[in-house]
Each structure stands twice: as C-alpha cells, then as structure tokens.
Amino acid sequence: MRPLLDEAKRRVDRRLSASRQSLSTSRIFPSALPERLKDDHDAQVDYTAPPGGGGTKEGHFQYMQQSIFGMIAAVGSQSDFHARFDDSSDSERDTDRPPQKRTEKESQATDAPPSSKNEKKALRSPQRPKSPSQERGRRHRKTLSGSRILRPLMPGSSQRQGGAQTEPSTGNQMSRVPSPERPRSTTPRAAPVLSRMVEAQALFDSKGSMNQSPRSPPAETQEEQSQEQTSASPLSLRLMEMFGFESPEKVLVEYACSLVQSMLLQGYMYVTEGHICFYAYLPRKSTVAIKSGYLYKRGRKNPKYNRYWFSLKGDVLSYYADPSNLYFPSGHIDLRYGISASLSEPKEKDREARDFQVTTDQRTYYFRADSSTSAKEWVKSLQKVIFRTHNDGDSVKISFPIESIIDIEESPMVDFAETFKIRAIESGETYAIDEYYFSFFNDGQDAFNFVKGLVSESQAKNPSRESPQPGRTTPQSRARGSRARWSLTSGLSQVLGSSDARRRRSASASQFSPGRDAAGLSPTSRQRDLSESFVNSFDQATESSTVLQSMTDTAESASQILNRSDVFQYPAMQPFRRQSLSEDQFGRRHSDETARSTNDIARLGPGITPRDVQRFYPPSDSDHDAQDAARVQQSASSLNELVRAGAYPLQRAAGLAEYLRNRSKQMGTLLASESMGYIEKVSGMWAGGRRHYGEAEGILPDDQDVDPEDKEDGCNHGDRFRAHFALPPTEKLQATYFAYLHRVLPLYGKIYVSQKKLCFRSLLPGTRTKMILPLKDVENVEKEKGFRFGYHGLVVIIRGHEELFFEFNAADVRDDCAVTIHQHLESVRFLSESGMLAEQEQDESEAAKAEHRMLQEARKDASGGLIPQTPSDESPEIHPIFDDPRASIINFKPTESLRITCLTIGSRGDVQPYIALCKGLLAEGHRPKIATHAEFEPWIRKHGIDFAPVEGDPAELMRICVENGMFTYSFLKEASMKFRGWIDDLLSSAWRSCQDSDLLIESPSAMAGIHIAEALRIPYFRAFTMPWTRTRAYPHAFAVPEHKMGGAYNYITYVMFDNVFWKAIAGQVNRWRQSELGLKATNLDKMQPNKVPFLYNYSPSVVVPPLDYPDWIRITGYWFLSEASDWTPPADLMAFIQRARDDGKKLVYIGFGSIVVSDPSALTRTVVESVQKADVRCILSKGWSDRLGDPASVKSEIPLPPEIFQIQAAPHDWLFSQIDAAAHHGGAGTTGASLRAGVPTIVKPFFGDQFFFGTRVEDLGVGICLKRLNVSLFSRALWEATHSERMIVKARNLGQQIRSEDGVATAIQAIYRDLEYAKTLARQRSIVSSTPFSPTPSAKTVAEQEVDDDVTDSEEWTFIGDETDIDISRRVRGRAVSDVDMLPEPLAVRSPELAQ
C-alpha cells in the first residue's frame, strides 16, 4: 500500500502522474484495498431490514424519522441506490487500463530528445522575425506526456532575465501560450478558400525576409547611452525602458490623473523634457458575468427581432433562448474582434434610442433594449469589454513628443474633476491629429498651466513646426524615434513597449496611427481599409461560417462539409497589385503554410493595409524600395476605389476568370482532393471513436485509427475547437469523443474535453446545438446503462442543473471519456483550491505587477518617499464615464419591531433551526415566537424566545408506523381512523397560536400557515430543510430514484407530490377555512404556493441553487445553533479520544438515531464487527435499542469491545470536531453538522429526505451513501472514509465553505428584501377569498380604499413567472373585481393592521 501524502502538491502529483492508476468512475480508492475488506458472504444482507417483512424487493424500507410527511409521501419515496461495491467494480477498473498504457507512452515520448520538427515555437519578438524553419516548425510540435496537467504547477517553469523571456525547455515545461488571436486557417471569419489562396500571394515575397535579424546599434552609441543612464534618476531610466526612449529624459513633474476614452483609465501622467507620458496599470480580465439581461436581436437575414437572454462574460457576448439553461447558448459574439458598440439613431427624433449595434470585423449585429437606459448601459459595458480585448494586457502606455503638440485647452466634462484636451500631430507620413483628454481630481489647474507653458516654449523654439515636411522612417527608426505612441501592452512585451510582441491587435504607433476611435484605428485609415475589405471579399460571413479544414478531419458537420467547396462560394475580386508571384511559389496548395501566412494578416485585426503588412513582414532585398512601394499602394488604392464604384457583377466574373486562367491546374487538384475529403469526413464522423491530443494539440501517436495526414495537421484541431465555441487561446484541447446527447431526442455530435471546459457540438444537418460546460460546475460523472439497447450511458452531474446524459456506441469509449473527465475534474479543483492561474496568465500578471511595482519604487525614490496617489490605486475595474461609482444600497430593514411567529411541527431536528433564526431576530430587535409541540417549550424558553403550543404529537404517528409498517393495509386502516382527528387538532391549535403576528414563517409540514396568513392578511414565508420548490435540478426529497432520471422526472415529482398531498388534506382544510377562518374554499391554483417566498436552511455549497429557481427562493445556509459552550464532555470520553490518538487509530462516530429495526442485536453486532474489521475506534450513539417496536423482540445486548465507546448524547458541533469520519442516517441537521466539521460522511438513509442528502453527499465526493448495511459494505466504507485522501480533502474544503457562511444573517436579509412582495401576495389572496365572516382590519374604509391598489399590486407581482401562473392570476384578479362589493365588515380586532 502506497503511503498517504498530506501535502496538496504531492497529492496532485500522485493523482496526475503518468504511472497513476486510472480513475474509477464511481469512487476512487487512494491505494489497494486490504484483503480483509473484500466482499464476504453477507454482502447482500441488510441488517436494517424493517419489522414485519414490509420491505421492498431490494430489502429497502423507509421509516418515519423526523418529518410528518412520511405518512403521506412515503409511498413515493421508495427508492434504491447502487451498491457502492458490487461485482462490476473489477470490470470497471479493467476498462480503465488503456488510458494508463497511453500515458506510459506519452511519458516515454516526453523523455526522448526532441527532433527538429518537434521543437516548440519560440515567442515572437518585434526585433527578431521568425525564420522559415521556425515557421514550419509550427505544424510539428512535441506531444505532451501524461502529466501535462501538472506542468503549470512545477516551479521554475519560466525564467525572466534582463526583462526578456527565456525559451522554455522542451521536456519539462509547457510551451508559451499565445495571446488571444485569430485561429490560423480555421477562423470562421476567414475568406473563402479560393479567395484566401489568391490573397496569400501578397505574403510569399515578404516571408523570405522573416529570418533577418535586427541591426544592433554601433558601439559608440551604446557607450553614450550607458554614460547617460549612469547619471539619470531611477524614474527616468524606468520610463526610458517602458516607453522606448533613445536616452533617459529628466522627469519634470508627475500627476495622478485619468485618461478619458469611452471609460476612465486611472493612472499617472509623467512630463519629461521631451515627452508627455501616461501609464495605467489594468487588472486581469474578469471571469464573471459583467452584465446579463433580456435583449432583442435582429436576425441575420430576417429583419424581425427575437428576444433572448444575453450574458456578457469575459470576451464573449452569448445569448440564450432559455435563461435557466445557460450551458446551451443559441449563439455568441466574439468581442476579441469587436470594433465598436454604439447607439443607433432613433427613427423619431423626439424618442430616445433603444436600439444599438455592435460592429465586428466581419459583421454588424443589431439589438434592441427594453428602455433607453438599458441600451446605454449595454453599450457602455460592451465598449469596456472591447477596450479590454484590444488591450489584452495589464497596462496602458501613451507617449507623444511635446514638440508634436498643437494646442491644449480646457474641456470641462464632469463636475467633480478638471479636464483638458491635448491635440497632437502624429510624426510620420499621415500627420493625423490626435486628441487626448485627461481628467484630474486634484491639481488639475496646475497641470494645465505647466503643460501649456511647455507647449508655448516648444512652439517658440520651433516656429516652422506647424508646416512639417513629409518624411519616411523605417519601422525601427520610428520605434526608437520621437513619435506619438498609444501602446496597450502586457508585461511580457516590456523592453521597448513595442508593437505586437505576439501579434496582438493593440499595437504601438510603429504600426498604427494613435488617433483611434473605439476600433482603435484612425478614421481615415479605417475608411481606406474597409473599402479595400469591401473589394476583397463578398463572402456571406456567419457566426459559425466555413473554415479551412484538414482533408480528413472528422469534426465537420454535414452542412459545413458542403460549405467547404469553393464552387458554392462567391469568388473574391483580387486587388490590383504591381507584382505577381511565381508559379512554383504558389504551387503548394495543400501546405498549411499558405493558409497560415494568409491568416497572419487577418490575425492583426481589421483594417490592416499593405503598408502595415510590410511593417509586420520586413521587405527582402529583392523587393521594391519604399518609395516605389508607396506609389504602388497609392495606385492600388485609387483603382480599388474605381472598382468599388464600378459594376458590381463584373467583380465576380473577373475574379473567377483570373483564377481559372492562372490556376487551372490547382483548381482541378483542389476539387478532386476535396471531393474525396467529403467522403472520408462523413464516414469518419459516423464511425465515432475517440482522440487524445498532446500539449501542442496534435493527436497522440498511440491513438488508434489515426490517419498519418491527420497527425501532421493535428495542430489545427485546437484552433477549430476554440473557433467553434469562442474560447481563448489558453483553452487547450485534450480529447474528443463522438456520442449522443439525450435531451428530448438523442442528438449525435462531438464531445470536446479541454483543460477547463466540457463542450458538445451537434453534427446533424439542420441542428445548431452547442454546449459549453465549465468543469468547475461538474460535480461528478457516473456510468449508467444506455437508454437504447446496445448503447452505453454516461451521466454528468452538474451543480444546480439537471443531469446530462450521453450515449456511446462502445463501452471502452464511454469509460475512457469518464476517466478523462475525472482526471480533469481533479486538476481543475486543485487549481481552484490552490489559487493557481494558468502559466501564461500568471506570468503576464506577475510581469505587469512587477513593472508597476518598479515604477512605484522609482517614483518614490524621485519624490523622496512622497508620491501622489490615484483615487483608487490598482482599481479593480475600468470606470464608465458619468456613471455613479457605486449604486446606493437600499436598507430593507423595517423601521418598527415586528411580531414574528415561526410555525413548525416534527422532531427536535425540525425545531432547532428556528431557535437559531429567532435568536438572530431577537438581536435585530424583533419579537419572535415559536409555535410547536409542548414538549419543546422548556428548550425554547431557555433561549429567551416566546412559545405557543401546537397540538398533534408526532410520536403518535411514529407509533402507527412502528406497529403496522409503512403503508401496509393495517397502517392505512388505522391512519384513516386516527389521522383525521390529528389534523383537525393541528389546524385549530395553529390558528390560535399565530394570533397577534405581523409576519408568519412556516415549515410546509405544518400545513396551516398559508391559510392563517391569508386570514390575518399578514406576510407569509416558508422555510424548510429539504427541497420543496419545483426544479429540474433535483428530485423531490421523498421521490429520489434509484438511478438518475433527468430533469423531466425531477420536475414531475414535485407536481405529483403537491397534488397528492393536497388531495389528502383538502377536505379538512377547506372545512376549517370556512368554519374558523371565515374564508372561501380554495385549491392549489388559487393558493399559488410556488409564488410564496421560500427560505431553505441548508448550505448553497451542499445543495447548489438551481438555475431555474425564481428570485424569491433563497438558499441561505445552515441555521446552526451552537450549544457546545454549555456542555462539558465526560472525562471517560475524553480519555477514549486521547487513547485513540495515542494509538494512531482513526476515530469515527456512528449513530443512526431512534430507528426501528427488526433485529437490534444483529445491527449492533454488524456495527461492532465492521469497526473491528476496519481497524478504527468508534464513538457509538445506539438509539435503535432504546425504542423497539415489538417488546417481544428484546434480546440480550451484545457487549461492546474496548474499540467502541457508547454515549447517550453530545452536541454535534463539539463531537464532530473530534473525529475523522461520521456515519449516520442522513437527516438534514445531522448531515449539515458533519459536513460543517469537514469530515467524510457515511449515510445509511432510512426515510424521506435522508435519501436526498445521502445522494448529495455522494455526488459531492465527500462521503458514501450505503444501499445496504452489512459487515462487508460498512467496514469497507469506514476504511475508505478514513483513508481516502481525495475524500478527506474534499470534505475539509466543503467544511471551510460551510463555516464561512452565516445562514441566519442571510435569511434575515432575505426576509427584509422580500417582505413587501409577501405583503402584496397576502393582500391579493385575502381580497379574493374573503367572506362576511373573515377577520379583517378594523376599518371598512381602509379595506375599500386599498382595493384598487391591491388589484394593481397583484398585476405587478404575478407577472413574474410562467404563463400558467399568469393565466391563473388573471382569473384571480377577475374574481377580485367582482367581489369588491362583498368585502366584509370586520369581525375581529385581534389581527394587526397592515403596514401602509
């Protein structure tokens, strides 16, 4: 048995190492199971079988334990669970061996020395263009070993020396991930195949010069620079490095200010002898949703607007048909290629604009908001995201020479800051005039006067500056000379702050003009580039348009395969160029070099001109000189304008004719090869299978049935994957599988597993289903039987969402997919727990922080320790202009003290949460009262809480269950005679106990609260310990199935239970309403229980809030009542605990509550033998021997061995903190206590909600849910709970989350927020159901005066929900209007008046 490792790093190393055992898809053992824990003869025996033989066919029986609903609902709660260990476990482990073999091969491949073709691509530097050999090396990357997930965790993965990035080693470090850029030949926004081939001609001549190295400055220049740097201040040296000055410049003054664009960028202005510089440190991009809500979107060809739910998250604007199903988007817009977001001019001038548009490099999207305010907020949010994506770094740098400033003037924009505008002219050939706005919260006038003085002096020195002569500089001279610069860079491209260190869109002025609009380009440049783009392509681009694919790739849908053919695409007009390429240069049709080189231009962003291409690719010696090239560009621009204004049909014909004339041979080869590719793609798509990808996203060499050409072209798989789902380049593809997704009907498609995402894309023609599921939202993966014969199922359990079902053709493919997802779940959880970022993200963040920190230190040294501060140093957000800095937080707390009644029935576990809540309400100044059974009165009053009695002893119901069995014939016979009187007493006593209340909070088990609140016209809340609200995420707690059944089944369990439960009590409740409450008879439609605000007192970390919960359903956290401070543990118990620690034995707690079993002695013997077999020490709470159903079954007690210590009672919060694992029945309170302590939990459920919480414990991976209780299974569960490091870590982390929650405080705030909504519902119901005998407020005029307001309020609130509820509310409002004249005179003044 391998030793257990405590350190998190070593744990993950063991889990992710190449030689690890494959993960099981059910429960994973940390090491081999001891021989003594193998299955014994009693593996199928259950010693908790019920008395009287009332069990089910599986020996599975349910008991009334803590809730009153057992008598009504237990017939629907009969459920079963998989055995934790059965005969199929060994076979499952065998099926996991192929991935292990693959991992070993990967490890061997990693240790081998890399070949020239497998060398990793080095980082692109602006001063070191890539050689052709390096460019060719892109397609042949070294595959990653099986421990690739652990690579970012290894120390020393990157080194930085002298501000430059060193190339990582091939064997031990991950290749540097490029910044967000266009996928190469696979971008969905690329031109058609023929057009891309023609466009590629422009790049072949320039590619030959890529291997030229930059010229180093002369030695004399270096010596002069070193002398200058010696005498310069640290701040001057730092600014020289950051902004690329030729020599250090003395810093005259600095100010804290904000650059005003479409948002405020807080930073610093540095005024040197020759430049004005601005620097702002930006945070990393957020991964949370920035904004979400409903919008209307116009179709691509249909002018009709359709309503969708939009979510702006990261760089992507996604939209959904159903807001509760956020893993299946209807589409997305990649804002990395966004140009602008702006409001549209309204058709009517007197109306405010509700329409806005988002322009990307290929398409304009049109939207409509519900209001002009909403439209403005969306536009601001989109502008901010587009700005961030253009930056894609962690800092903003601007510098321009003082001599280029034309003028400076004050430009007041906001009242709380002084703003002035600087107009500067760009040095170079365009002389574009740029405007910069700077806002100062302090010292604005001083800054204005100082800069204005410098400008005046500069103009006096250079009087002829206003009429500059055109001149040309090379890219290198421009990069080092005086020029206006707008550089949006990250820390990795820091030395000269130069352009495009990794081809990012945000470039310095050496490539782009600094005068940029929201697109980041100057208007003149943008107009010219758009016109050229208009000529170049008439492709009808779509969100998932055709992409250049590999000939044998199986990732194609049928519709995409047809779109691949160039015959079905519009030809593009070739722009007129002076030079042409030789035939042999362009002859390599099937080489990826052509497509990739073409796309290098596209990756630079929209509006890139031939001049920009020449800057990016330095011209070779054989090219024309710069002036000749400029004339060619001017000529081409003029001719393009003529073509654009000329005959449109001629463009298609000319383009096609020219192509057929010059490339007829390539055309024939293209059609012949692609037609064969279609057949291969379709056959491969339906053949299915699986593929794994290495670090460079090439197919691993040991994958079966892989075409050799696919291996060579494998690096494109990741690009296509990211293009399909608009994912960043950091998302690396790991594996793909072909499978069916079961929703309504099985949908064939492809599963993609990446580092952080689980994605699915349908491949059937006419379907557009896509799924993007973050792995952090996946709780577990389980293997199931397929829905269809011959198929193998896989269930993905998701946090707060219904399960997803996949079907595979082969069991080994299903098992491989399950193991792969499990492995990635472990790595994702470790990364999130340790707070580690992706390697590139971490490097960029640290580099930018280091640069910012060094600048701060230099400023501090220059100012003698005193530096000006920005209003918000290192602000976490970019602030929109004119927006309030933070919305005011409304205080919902009532001004007066409220009389709050909490109504509940049941056992001690049902009352304890209300005591904790009432103690919190007491602290808030309210007057709470608990109405429950009389036996709990001393306990309640001990905490200073008022008490009111409620009839109906639950012990009577327990006696019926014990003596007759659950839902047997004798049970139904006796219950029909005794239970009716029990309900009548409960309803009448509850009505009396709830008088003099301003607010009623009730457990649904009491059955009377909603009617009492209706009669008293007071707000009504519900609170419970188990799910009671309809959802597709979880089944009803009393109807947990043996297997996962999906969202439809989950939802129908609530509907069925509500109807069955109401039918059982409807007759008695309606008679009570009429006789005592003076209300009309009601039904479920009139009560609308699903509209009632609900408080669930369990942790959102245990039961994640479902996505389809409405706003008034709150999961607040556990309402724990801490009583350990008043309890002193016995000395013998403390001695037993200390002795176990001294012996090095694990300590467990076992207690199943007051359950009833047919043979208590057999259960005791099972516990004793299991403890001894697992070799643990046990604290036992043996409640099952104290309350036997049949006195004749009393037998002699089994003596307890010294390994077991029996206790009668102990506070859970103290006891569970002393143990290593807990085994209990799974009640809501006990489960919460064990999970809060952070110990693994074993649940053996007996009744009702215990099955639900047992399932949650197992799904979360923090414990085990046992189907049967015997020595074989129980001993194995005890051993695993105390030895499984994976389970122990998960339980510890979950305990930390639960302890950080404050459920009582959250519940109180939820009550305050929903109080007005609850009042509205109460008034609405009371108006509809009132009779002349109803108790109402004391004045008739008050009731009549509020009639109109009540009807209005009901319309406002009831429209929140589905259509069925709206129709119901309309019928209710109609009856309310007809019953207005029948409002009764008040008969009682005991009820409080409503808050007006």
Curated annotation (Swiss-Prot):
**GO biological-process terms attached to the record:** autophagy; carbohydrate metabolic process; lipid glycosylation; protein transport; sterol biosynthetic process
Question: Which Enzyme Commission numbers does its entry carry?
Answer: 2.4.1.-, 2.4.1.173
Protein residues bound to UDP-alpha-D-glucose: 907-908, 910, 1210, 1212, 1225, 1229-1230, 1249-1250
- Gene Ontology MF terms: sterol 3-beta-glucosyltransferase activity
Instruction: Give the GRAM domain ranges.
Output: 237-288, 719-785
Cellular component (GO) terms are:
phagophore assembly site membrane
UniProt xrefs under Pfam families: EryCIII-like_C, Glyco_transf_28, GRAM, PH
Q: Where is the composition biased (Basic and acidic residues)?
A: 1-16, 35-44, 82-108, 585-595, 846-862
The answer to whether UniProt assigns keyword Membrane to this entry is yes
Task: Please name the top-level EC class of this enzyme.
Answer: transferase
Provide ranges: composition bias, Polar residues.
18-28, 156-175, 459-479, 487-497
Q: Gene3D superfamilies, alphabetically? A: Glycogen Phosphorylase B (3.40.50.2000), Pleckstrin-homology domain (PH domain)/Phosphotyrosine-binding domain (PTB) (2.30.29.30)
Domain (PH): residue spans on this chain:
289-387
Region annotated Disordered sits at 1-59, 82-193, 206-233, 459-531, 576-635, 841-880
> What membrane topology does this protein have?
Peripheral membrane protein
State the compartments where it is located: Cytoplasm; Preautophagosomal structure membrane
Q: Which UniProt keywords apply?
A: Autophagy, Cytoplasm, Glycosyltransferase, Lipid biosynthesis, Lipid metabolism, Membrane, Protein transport, Repeat, Steroid biosynthesis, Steroid metabolism, Sterol biosynthesis, Sterol metabolism, Transferase, Transport
Reaction(s) catalyzed by this protein? a sterol + UDP-alpha-D-glucose = a sterol 3-beta-D-glucoside + UDP + H(+); ergosterol + UDP-alpha-D-glucose = ergosteryl 3-beta-D-glucoside + UDP + H(+)
Its UniProt domain note says: The GRAM and PH domains are required for the localization of ATG26 to the preautophagosomal structure (PAS) and are involved in autophagy.
- What family is this? Belongs to the glycosyltransferase 28 family.
Name assigned to this protein: Sterol 3-beta-glucosyltransferase
Gene label: atg26
